[in-house]
Amino acid sequence: MPRMFGTEGVRGLANRDLTAQLALDLGDAAVRVLGDDERSEFESRRRALVGRDTRVSGDFLAAALSAGMSAGGFDVIDAGIIPTPGVAYLTSVLNVEMGAVISASHNPMPDNGIKFFARGGFKLPDTKEDEIEAVLGQDWDRPTGAGVGRVSHDTATATNLYIDHLVSAIAPVGPEKSQPTPLKGLKIVADCANGATSVVAPEALRRAGADVTVINASPDGYNINKNAGSTHPEQLQAMVKASGAVMGVAFDGDADRCLAVDEDGNMVNGDQIMGILARAKKNAGKLNHDTLVVTVMSNLGLKLALRSMGIKTVQTNVGDRYVLEEMLRGDYSLGGEQSGHVINREFATTGDGTLTALTLCNEVVKSGKSLKELAADFPQLPQTLINVPNVDKMAAKTNAKVQAAVEREEKLLGDTGRVLLRPSGTEPLVRVMAEAETQQQADEVCDRLAKVVADELTL
């Protein structure tokens, strides 16, 4: 039986796969597992924090999850609508036992998900998720009377604490208590995807001094990610060009990722953003071990550019949790994914799109260069990605004919490109990726491999 927890927690179609009962059971199981942690003796009343994105299903799922936690003896702080990295940050600074966020990130509105954070704001390791799954739905000696928990609601305080933290990353308040404005005069456009950062990102950018035009920041429960945000940047590209802004930033539904647009409307992806920030950290003496942590999906062009700047790369599997694990293991300060998840360990324990936007804008100002000029230092090899659906994804690495096809293409490309087959962490599909010197060559290689995968692995 497959694991319930995927790379981003438990996800599925809300009210079909992810029901109120399942949310209740997950809250109940989580307090049993995480409440048994030896650190829980720290407080007489154990506490949890719950936040969510703007999906309409978040209301009933938050209520059910909080009910499971409070029935298990935890006091629950409902932070309301807040970005996923905001939940991680508040889990740490409010010293609660655990945090949970209800979101399906960049997925369509009908989906939703539940993801947990341990004390300190770190995502749970696989072992803890497996423990939660193992006790899911089991009966146990639940508390009664004064032993049950309460649920409190305080969106404003939670949001303001998080915004203060974000702004302080580039504009720390000095002894005079006045707020510096390092982004003063920077004209930008922010696309909030009608998601969780619809309040946070515009306010943080404005507090830092930016002149912000905001689009897609009117969530109604149904329009999250709909033709908006990092998965649909067309509106942002058009608005940047039409408004004369110097750049734009786009978030996904839970704002754990950020992509950017230069003054001409060209996309600046996560690899290029990481390259810009890694170079800035190296120049400031803050890039630990002169190393950036990337995933197998990062473009070969990024690695080649960084190598010429004296910056090494360490590669992990896809998923910001695996990036963070490697960062902690090797004491690295910066890492992330091509998709726009960027982890700046100086300020965060997970990918934070709003933090990424602030630090990227700050680097544009400090460098005196345009985003287009900065991104040009990190050229990308032409890349093609094909999703092959309805296949036996776990056989992609073992099927003899598929592996023989991979070897043929790798030999053909030599040192000028690469190929990658990656099973999806959440869907029955295999992602086939190819990079080459020309777009035509990348397309041809990817098409050939995708056909072999479909022919050999279709269910």
Show the residue positions of the predicted features:
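An N-terminal, well-structured beta->alpha segment
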Residues: 1-67, 71-72, 98, 151-188, ...
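Gly/Ser/Thr-enriched, mixed-charge loops and adjacent short helices
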Residues: 13, 112-243
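N-terminal small/polar loop signature for handling phosphorylated ligands or for N-terminal nucleophile
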Residues: 32, 36-41, 47-111, 203-261
